[in-house]
């Protein structure tokens, strides 16, 4: 199989990863809460009824923001039912999932659960804008966040929570575009109530972060029009707009299922374009970020039959999908899609956390175990913090019925302080290993710390109660890093995490911009004897490539795969860098316009610049001669030979210098 390739350079980044990208979701649905995170009679339960075995797995998973209480559940949610003494809390019908809600796990228990996860866990609270409105949202905000001295804040203290909950991130309803939603609204109706709620909540706390409801999927008939209408009302009042997407194979189309991230990336880019279009129309400098607060692999087609058969039970077994290796590979590819858009996707919530389409499964009174999807998420959360590098893959492709031609390789990379890089990669091929070659430019990394893969000879292999460790990541041999080239072989249908690092982590990282010129004493010239050992190629490189990257970027140089660059349309090889530098040389060349039929074959520079008449192509070329190494054996400071200036055939070499325009 042809080798897949891409280049990594810290000068070309997407953006910093927001820790909220590794959020999750706890909804009062099925066994997510009851016998999931909360089971008072369990052998590992603490005094609050929280399962300690589940808490340990949640910490290992690396979850940050946790969205609560829904989901469809929130459109019938009365927050007052979930506070106060447990014995006084009412039982309610949950219309969304045809279940009975006991309210034994409520707002206080949710905050306690987050505190026990650790300081990285952040509340993300949804308010009911389906059957309720502005007043109820304000009362919930006052109860949760106001310090003291009001009826609702004092009521919270009476309930045992003297300190405010400090909820900063709020969702203004859930999936209000969906006809299945209790209290479904049109975009105009929802936009007005969301704007009123946001404006009022900011009167209590101007620093709250608010998420407006976007479309429930890219396939919705109102997609894009919904976002545009809602943002027209709320653009200056909210910080994020939500996206929801779930994927499953349809009619046995596995190839399209494996390329599901193609749809997710398209979804993200279309919503970004819509948001920016609205901002431009409103002449606003503000950018709306994206909250992808529901995403997963979900075999949704069987859900309707499960729900319609229920007769209002408590915590029924619903949506308990058991994930295979293939599901985990698609899941990992969705994670890669989120990381590749980290500049605009600043919040993401895996739906859900326990039992319900979840990476963690439990048995009432029994153990908890990890699903196959647990491992890509935990590795991405652990090693995917930092700056996402811009990855443009050159990969073999395959055909899909749904998305057309798709790459076999889906990849991204995250750099931390230029001391380590983690490559996350998925091989979508079901039949063959995929050779991978990565060029590391501007990254002084020399060793592979770990190459871990999630794959199996049986793509349908799963972890179950009987075999909880049937599928686990395994180390991969043969991955190497030499002379700035990372090479690996990605197993068929696999999720891969490859970590590379600097062998000298004790040294402080270089500050951005440091080393923009050579100020030290130049080393002695290399020996002229042909028998002398050749110096290490890495020793001839610049001690810092930040200056190189900045100057090339300033000259509008586009980097191409594997160390090639393009300067205004002219592909050139990057120069070899040495401690002995020559200054940059700038030359300008005017290209004469192509002669028209019947016109003279040569024209003067003056004629070439006359607008109209002949061809209007008056192209000015800006050519950069970078630092060049002095000739071997020469004294320091000896100028390097000047290259001949390239001009297009027929161009005038005597053209006057002029400024470049692009």
Swiss-Prot record:
Optimum pH is 6.0. Residues 454-483, 497-548, 588-662 are annotated as: Disordered. GO terms for cellular component: cytoplasm. Residues 537-547 have a biased composition (Basic and acidic residues). GO terms for molecular function: alpha-L-arabinofuranosidase activity. InterPro entries: Alpha-L-AF_C, Glyco_hydro_b, Glycoside_hydrolase_SF. Alpha-L-arabinofuranose binds at residues 27, 72, 174, 246, 294, 352. Involved in the degradation of arabinan and is a key enzyme in the complete degradation of the plant cell wall. Catalyzes the cleavage of terminal alpha-(1->5)-arabinofuranosyl bonds in different hemicellulosic homopolysaccharides (arabino-oligoxylosides, branched and debranched arabinans). It acts rapidly on the short-chain arabino-oligoxylosides from digestion of xylan with xylanases. It hydrolyzes slowly arabinan and arabinoxylan from wheat and rye flour. Belongs to the glycosyl hydrolase 51 family. This is Intracellular exo-alpha-(1->5)-L-arabinofuranosidase. It comes from Streptomyces lividans. The gene is abfA.
């Amino acid at each position: 199989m042809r080798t897949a390739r891409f280049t990594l350079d810290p000068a070309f980044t997407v953006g910093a990863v927001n820790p909220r990208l590794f959020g999750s979701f706890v909804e009062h649905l099925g066994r997510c809460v009851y016998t999931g995170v909360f089971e008072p009679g369990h052998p590992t339960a603490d005094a609050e009824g929280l399962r300690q075995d589940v808490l340990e797995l949640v910490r290992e998973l690396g979850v940050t923001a946790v969205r609560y209480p829904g989901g469809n559940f929130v459109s019938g949610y009365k927050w007052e039912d979930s506070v106060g003494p447990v014995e006084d809390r009412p039982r309610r019908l949950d219309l969304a999932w045809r279940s009975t809600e006991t309210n034994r796990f409520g707002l206080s228990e949710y905050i306690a659960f987050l505190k026990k996860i650790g300081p990285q866990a952040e509340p993300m609270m949804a308010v009911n804008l389906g059957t309720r409105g502005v007043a109820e949202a304000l009362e919930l905000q006052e109860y949760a966040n106001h310090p003291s001295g009001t009826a609702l804040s004092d009521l919270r203290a009476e309930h045992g929570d003297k300190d405010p909950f400090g909820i900063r991130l709020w969702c203004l309803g859930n999936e209000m575009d969906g006809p299945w939603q209790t209290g479904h609204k049109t975009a105009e109706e929802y936009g007005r109530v969301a704007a009123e709620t946001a404006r009022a909540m900011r009167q209590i706390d101007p620093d709250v972060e608010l998420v407006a409801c976007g479309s429930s999927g890219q396939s919705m008939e109102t997609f894009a029009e919904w976002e545009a209408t809602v943002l027209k009302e709320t653009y200056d009042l909210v910080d994020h707009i939500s996206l929801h997407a779930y994927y499953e194979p349809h009619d046995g189309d596995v190839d399209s299922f494996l390329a599901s991230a193609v749809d997710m990336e398209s979804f993200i880019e279309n919503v970004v374009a819509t948001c920016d279009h609205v901002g431009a129309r409103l002449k606003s400098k503000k950018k709306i970020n994206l909250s992808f607060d529901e995403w997963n692999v979900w075999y949704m087609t069987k859900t309707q039959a499960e729900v319609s058969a229920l007769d209002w039970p408590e915590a029924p077994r619903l949506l308990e999908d058991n994930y295979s290796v293939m599901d985990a590979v698609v899941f990992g590819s969705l994670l890669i899609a989120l990381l590749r858009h980290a500049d605009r996707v600043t919040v993401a919530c895996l739906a859900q956390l326990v039992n319900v389409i979840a990476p963690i499964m439990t048995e009432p009174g029994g153990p908890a175990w990890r699903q196959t999807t647990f491992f890509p998420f935990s590795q991405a959360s652990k090693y995917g913090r930092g700056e996402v590098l811009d990855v443009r893959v050159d990969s073999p492709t395959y055909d899909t019925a749904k998305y057309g031609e798709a790459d076999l390789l889906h990849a991204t990379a995250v750099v931390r302080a230029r001391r380590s890089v983690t490559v996350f990669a998925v091989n979508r091929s079901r039949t063959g290993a995929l050779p991978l070659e990565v060029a590391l430019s501007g990254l002084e990394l020399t060793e592979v710390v770990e190459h871990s893969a999630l794959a199996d000879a049986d793509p349908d292999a799963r972890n179950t109660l009987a075999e909880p460790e049937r599928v686990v990541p395994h180390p991969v041999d043969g991955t190497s890093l030499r002379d700035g080239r990372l090479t690996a072989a990605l197993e068929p249908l696999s999720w891969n995490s490859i970590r590379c690092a600097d062998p000298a982590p004790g040294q402080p990282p270089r500050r951005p911009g440091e080393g923009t010129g050579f100020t030290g004493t130049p080393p002695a010239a290399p020996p002229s004897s042909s028998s002398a050992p050749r110096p290490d190629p890495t020793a001839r490189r610049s001690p810092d490539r930040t200056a190189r990257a900045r100057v090339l970027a300033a000259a509008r140089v586009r980097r191409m795969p594997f160390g090639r660059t393009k300067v205004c349309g002219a592909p050139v090889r990057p120069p070899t860098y040495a401690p002995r530098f020559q200054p940059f040389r700038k030359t300008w060349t005017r290209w004469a316009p192509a002669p028209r039929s019947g016109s003279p074959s040569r024209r003067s520079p003056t004629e070439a610049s006359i607008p109209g008449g002949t061809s209007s192509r008056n192209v000015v070329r800006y050519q950069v001669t970078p630092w060049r190494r002095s000739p071997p054996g020469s004294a320091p400071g000896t100028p390097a030979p000047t290259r001949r200036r390239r001009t297009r055939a027929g161009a005038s070499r005597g053209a006057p210098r002029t400024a470049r325009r692009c």
